[in-house]
Amino acid sequence: MKRCLLSLALLLSLTACHPQAVRSHVAVDGAVGGAVPMVGVPVTATDHAGRRVVSVVTDTQGRFSFVLDGVGPFVLTAPSGDDDGAPATLSAVFSPAAGQASAVVNLDPVTTLQTQRALGAVLDGAPDTVQMAGLDAARIANADKDVAGVLAPLYAAFHVPADAANDSAGGTSSHADAGNPWTALFSVVHFDMRHGTVGVGSDADRAVVSVPAQGVPSAAVPARAAASALALAQGATTTPIQHVIVVIGENQTFDGLFGGYVPAAGQSVKNLLSEGIIKADGTPGPNFALAAQSKGTPSQAYTLQPERAGSYATLPQPLQIGEMDPVTFENAVGTPDARFPGNLPNGPFQITRYVPYRDAGKDGLAATVVTGDPVHRFFQMWQQTGGDNARLDMFTWVAANTGMGGDTKGVSPANPAQGGELMGFMNMSAGDAPLFRSLAQHYALSDNYHQSIMGGTGANFFAIATADAPFFNKDGQLAVPPANQIENPDPMPGTPNFYTRDGYSGGSYVDCSDPKQPGVAAIRAFLDARHIPSKCAPGAYYLVNNYNPGYDMDGRPEPIGPDNYTYPPQTVPTIAEALAKRGVSWKWYTGGRDTADVAAEASAWHVSVAKAQMLQYNNIGDPLVASSKVMGDPTLKSGLAGLATLDSDLAHHTLPAVSFVVPKGFDSGHPGYSAPASYEAFLKDLLAKVQADPALWAHTAILITTDEGGGHFDTGYIQTVDFFGDGPRIAMLAASPYARKGVVDHAYGDHASILKFIERNWRLQPLSPRSRDNLPDPVTKVGHPYRPINGPAVDDLMSLFQF
């Protein structure tokens, strides 16, 4: 029999003509989702008596198929995320006709409103026996009429066919399709299924209509709101956001900045304070032992779970590692930092109990109060967290016994040059990080956003631009790097945990497709136990730690060889290419790239402009410099700019649609030579410049984050996505007139989420078949908001906004 697409009205007529006692045997397929497909979620069918008769999981397109065998009407349900990111249930009613062999039934926001109205209840999972007992043809017909009446102007504006206006089956897709009115409608209309409301249109033309599960529906969608929604669907963006500015500081975990944050009433946050690890004054709390650090025992091979050997009595003395002298610009090595006591309690400590947040009596660079720079490298971070950060207790021992690797200047088995500095945090409850606190109160904050790659800056900036990882190659073809540059994290004999080959002037590549390679087997076993693909191409040596890119900022190739800690030019697809192909303007602004960025500082510091650029320009934070496609195309290359260009673009109203902004090194917040107060000062200035242009600010989203956590302690759950990460939590703030004020969002995200936001807003495809922006949006259970049930999954950040 030919497969048929049944409208709800037709199903109702069939139900009326054929008693519910008729047993059905129907092959059903369909799709689950709205603006995006719901991937990896269970679809459950419940029969007229409240029995769950079948359940299957959606595929990578959000589609499903099963055979329904029983007596209808049936209610199909699937877990989903609501418009604000909270857990919700998608649903649809299906009443098969006698003898019907097949049907297409979709679960989307419209079918959900219809089902909730028919049942008189908002579902949390499959309906129960009592709810199903009240479901009959009359209630279904009335629900159909109510929803159609409220949404009729929207259907008319989007030219939804009359025979489909009561059933949006076939309309789910992850990307807009002009040939599918349902896809276009779902891409710009915002459904709050739990509350039965629908937000239509934008700005002055926006209207919110209501189709509650019980009670009187609102009036129909106003014509102006429907027209506004259609204009969005036909316009350049799917939201009112016309400019996205992504600001990327450095090396702070979520707990490192927001460990003492108290959210607004009605909001919750997972941090040091809420977990009872600290008190509001920064001293140890009743659950301080949750963060107690353990010692490990030596092993012959790299392991994610070193055997524990008891706890530290006190933290190791914090060290001065990486602390820069503001006059000589020399960095300290692993010597004790006398500002901190040598007997700190074994757990997190408030940094500003011992040093000021900012030196108020000084100006410029001298006002920055620096602290030691914790190790933040790939294999160390995997070992510190155990992959998922379930135990929290190995941060200190791994750092203190491994350091930044023996291929790093000043680091040796006798002195790994790491102490207890990684356990320090800023305390907002005591007045620290006032701008970050204010931004969280006035805009939206995520407490479940993560660095993409275990380890440091280079790999994470590359992930921000590509949702992927760089690899060693020769003329674009896979090749083997010099032997001295291949990682070996197996401990040296006679040391507690000092890696055999690791460091910024040495081991940084790994062939993770080969379990026989040092360090690979432990991580692959962790992945295999959780059925997570490694994403390691056969024979590819991936760069997992910091090397310089293959070009200088002007596009001149850098030498590649055993004594050159530079990775070859990359062909990995970038967001720059995708935006350019779509005709969306973009720039990547990196502090220090323009000579004008550092001219005043060069004069003040009595150094050359070239020296000032060397100090301030973060070449590994300018990841598009690594791309042969970007650097080989004059048009693409022209999108790489400095902060003087950013200031000019803001002043002349020529800011591109998508901007990535990287502060100068001393403003980045990176421990050792910067601090959170310096990053705040940079953000304050940037926000003021954007908000000084009301027309720009009105339709702008500023996404504020860091590249990675810098090796600092954090309590957040880590979802393993592939061999490369994710890594620990970092902050993500969304500042915009459209941000949900004071909201703490729990949807799971990483740096691919930035790309997913851009792609959804400007209707772009994922960057490549293997890039992480292909991952589905996360779905969670009520009461468990941090762990996706359909992982690996990462958010698109849309739940930080209310459009």
Annotate each PLM feature.
Residues 18-234, 274:
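Feature for extracytoplasmic/surface-facing segments of secreted or surface-associated proteins
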Residues 1-4:
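Positively charged n-region of N-terminal signal peptides that target proteins for export
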Residues 224-803:
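N-terminal pro-sequences and low-complexity stem/linker regions of secreted or lumenal proteins
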Residues 13-16:
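C-terminal motif of bacterial Sec signal peptides marking the signal peptidase cleavage site
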